[in-house]
Regions:
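Hydrophobic h-region of N-terminal signal peptides that target proteins for export
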Residues: 10-18
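Sec-dependent signal peptide recognition
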Residues: 2-10
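Extracytoplasmic c-type cytochrome modules immediately beyond a signal peptide or single-pass transmembrane anchor
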Residues: 18-140, 149-183
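Short, cysteine/histidine-rich loop/knuckle motifs that typically chelate Zn2+
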Residues: 143
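Short Cys/His-rich local motifs and their 1-3 flanking residues in nucleic-acid-associated proteins
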Residues: 146
């Protein structure tokens, strides 16, 4: 809840301070910021996987992913978050509007359609949001988000760290969630 409040306050403050961006600038900024987040988080998780395996990566995520996301937001002057319908951390649960987009993208995948690289949406309140799909495209992702044996040390660590976890059972090419960048 605290993270949502901080996201909302930062979002409103950024709207009041910044000059309006053009659509092209929003696309460019959204692409840059989301790519930076994916790279920073991915590099950290890769290091954790190499040095301590999936459990180390899980602990890194639980302790650092939100603050790393906040750091990227602060550095970029945007509001950014990662969301999913099948979230691991309840803080990353998609809103009603975000679920609608994720469900639309799920339907596209089910019909063998290609997902857009991004979606730029103007909300009813006049604000614009950049959405970027997160697709499982690396075997390493499946170590923590694939089919996890119920009695494995990793499954136990996930359950201890995230009692409400819903983020397993994915396959290569599945939609994991999306990155949301607000302007």
């Amino acid at each position: 809840m605290k993270r949502l409040a901080v996201f909302s306050l930062f979002f409103i403050a950024s709207l009041l301070i910044a000059e309006p961006l053009t659509q092209e600038q929003m696309i460019q900024k959204g692409t840059e910021v989301s790519t930076t987040l994916v790279q920073k988080l991915g590099n950290e998780l890769k290091t954790q996987m190499q040095t301590g395996g999936p459990i180390a990566a899980l602990h890194f995520c639980s302790q650092n992913a939100l603050s790393l996301t906040d750091q990227v937001a602060k550095e970029s002057g945007t509001a950014i978050k990662r969301v999913s319908i099948q979230n691991r951390n309840p803080v990353n649960a998609a809103t009603f509007e975000e679920k609608a987009i994720l469900n639309q993208w799920q339907a596209m995948l089910k019909n063998s359609e290609t997902l857009p690289a991004y979606q730029l949406t103007k909300l009813s309140n006049g604000h614009t949001v950049y959405y970027k799909p997160i697709v499982i495209n690396k075997d390493a992702c499946l170590k923590c988000h694939g089919d996890i044996a119920g009695d494995s040390p990793l499954a136990k660590a996930i359950k201890e760290t995230y009692p409400e976890d819903q983020a397993t059972g994915y396959k290569m090419g599945d939609l994991r969630g999306m990155i949301v960048v607000a302007f």
